[in-house]
């Protein structure tokens, strides 16, 4: 190493090459010693000697203090999201105002039941409600942007699902490990990573080693909630371009559903338009041509606070359902297309569960069932959960109790839904809010 010039050497004055330099002790005895505070540099203050008019060879020099430079705090007020997403979203939007989704005017003028002034007033009254939804939607966009750019063949489904869920927890600021924290905000339901003929409700349980392959078609369905306001949105990933038309058919069918939705829109008619759009597409896979079929026993749905399925269903095929959408309602418009039968059934190991909102109060003979129900009530309420979430909370040996809760009708199980083996399915989904003056596609992004 090269020798460094110290401050003590810099301040040393040599009057004469032959002169003897005073020692520290001699300087002190002669009254020439500098105060210790001035003899040392400070991190905050730098001093510069300034020659005064009367300063001679042995005279004292005046000193000027530099202004303190404000120290920058590491990570203070970040302006952009990290990679992977870990910056709390509220730090990126300190005003508490979050990006507005896509605002779409209603097509039917008869849907305007109030004046423009009244509608604007109602929108202002709903501001807290809308900001919670918009916050959740922006988190969904940022998390999926990273996920879509980084999901690659060779990753396990567990890595993919947990990566998404960890990002959601970080951006909402709710890790979900403390009692009740997940009910305030965070992951709204288990992340679905559904391959090929599996259309929905597949999330890996502990020990699952399934690996994503280049030839797979994977539906990624995840949710974010703030104070129970659930943003439910899904997309499909395929690496092989031969599946492009399948994905495009379903994406456009979902956009058709959004276009037809609105105050007083009849659910059965929306399904008819969705079906027409999807069936207008064909896809050639491995030399065989398929018409893209809507999966007729899967539907969109309304969303209530802390309840992913509110009671209304939005069909994706023509039906006689005359039920109308109403002002203020929130809907998940989702469509599923298939190269198979266009019909799904329960199959494979179950991972998804949810407590029934109006569950019966029945005596539980299995002690572990009562203990588990207490954990579910305090950590999930009526939000869906999966076995991995129970594992994460430190629960073990709970399967007997969980099955007992299911058999008593207290908890509903949601097994994976599959079309025929060898077929391929795709899904796209958005959450919309029927505001008084327009419908807002809350989860809309640049990607879909």
From Swiss-Prot:
Molecular function GO labels: initiator methionyl aminopeptidase activity; metal ion binding; metalloaminopeptidase activity
Gene Ontology BP annotations: proteolysis
Cysteines joined through disulfide linkages: none
Comp. bias regions, Acidic residues: 37-50
CDD domains for this protein: MetAP2
Pfam hit, one: Peptidase_M24
Ranges annotated as biased composition (Basic residues): 61-74
Record EC number: 3.4.11.18
InterPro entries reported in the protein's UniProt record: Creatinase/aminopeptidase-like, Met_Aminopeptidase_Type2, Pept_M24, Pept_M24_MAP, Pept_M24A_MAP2, WH-like_DNA-bd_sf, WH_DNA-bd_sf
Residues annotated as binding substrate: 201, 309
Catalytic activity: Release of N-terminal amino acids, preferentially methionine, from peptides and arylamides
UniProt binding sites for a divalent metal cation 2: 232, 301, 334, 429
Region named Disordered: 1-94
Localization (cell): Cytoplasm
Cofactor(s) in the UniProt record: Co(2+); Zn(2+); Mn(2+); Fe(2+)
Name of protein: Methionine aminopeptidase 2
Species this chain originates from: Botryotinia fuckeliana (strain B05.10)
Lineage, highest ranks first: Eukaryota, Fungi, Dikarya, Ascomycota, Pezizomycotina
């Amino acid at each position: 190493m090269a020798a460094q010039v110290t401050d003590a050497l810099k301040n040393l004055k040599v009057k004469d090459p032959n002169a003897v330099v005073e020692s520290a002790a001699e300087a002190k005895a002669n009254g020439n010693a500098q105060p210790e505070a001035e003899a040392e540099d400070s991190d905050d203050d730098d001093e510069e000697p300034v020659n005064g008019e009367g300063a001679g060879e042995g005279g004292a020099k005046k000193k000027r203090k530099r202004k303190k430079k404000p120290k920058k705090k590491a990570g203070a007020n970040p302006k952009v999201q990290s990679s992977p997403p870990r910056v709390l979203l509220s730090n990126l939007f300190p005003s508490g105002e979050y990006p507005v989704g896509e605002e779409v005017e209603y097509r039917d003028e008869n849907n305007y039941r109030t004046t423009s002034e009244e509608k604007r007033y109602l929108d202002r009254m709903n501001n807290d409600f809308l900001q919670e939804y918009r916050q959740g939607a922006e988190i969904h966009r940022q998390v999926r942007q990273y996920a879509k750019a980084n999901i690659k063949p060779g990753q396990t489904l567990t890595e993919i699902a947990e990566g998404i869920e960890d990002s959601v927890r970080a951006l909402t600021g709710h890790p979900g490990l403390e009692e009740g924290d997940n009910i305030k905000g965070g992951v709204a339901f288990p992340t679905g990573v559904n391959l090929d003929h599996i259309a929905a409700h597949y999330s890996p349980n502990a020990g699952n080693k399934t690996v994503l392959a280049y030839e797979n078609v994977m539906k990624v369905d995840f949710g974010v909630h703030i104070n129970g306001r659930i943003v439910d949105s899904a997309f499909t990933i395929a690496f092989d371009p031969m599946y492009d038309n399948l994905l495009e058919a379903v994406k456009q069918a979902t956009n058709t559903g959004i276009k037809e939705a609105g105050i007083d829109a009849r659910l059965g008619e929306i399904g008819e338009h969705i079906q027409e759009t999807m069936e207008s597409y064909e896809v050639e896979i491995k030399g065989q041509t398929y018409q893209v079929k809507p999966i007729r026993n899967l539907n969109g749905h309304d969303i209530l606070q802390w309840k992913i399925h509110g009671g209304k269903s939005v069909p994706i095929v023509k039906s006689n359902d005359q039920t109308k959408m109403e002002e203020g309602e929130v809907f998940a418009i989702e469509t599923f297309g298939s190269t198979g039968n266009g019909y799904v059934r329960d199959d494979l190991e179950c991972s998804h569960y949810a407590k029934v909102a109006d569950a019966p109060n029945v005596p539980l003979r299995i002690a572990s069932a009562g203990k588990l129900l207490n954990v579910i009530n305090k950590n999930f309420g009526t939000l869906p959960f999966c076995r991995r979430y129970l594992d994460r909370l430190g629960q073990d040996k709970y399967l007997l109790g969980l099955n007992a809760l299911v058999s008593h009708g207290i908890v509903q199980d949601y097994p994976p839904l599959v079309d025929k083996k060898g077929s391929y399915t795709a899904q796209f989904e958005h959450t919309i809010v029927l505001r008084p003056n327009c419908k807002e596609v809350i989860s809309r992004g640049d990607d879909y």
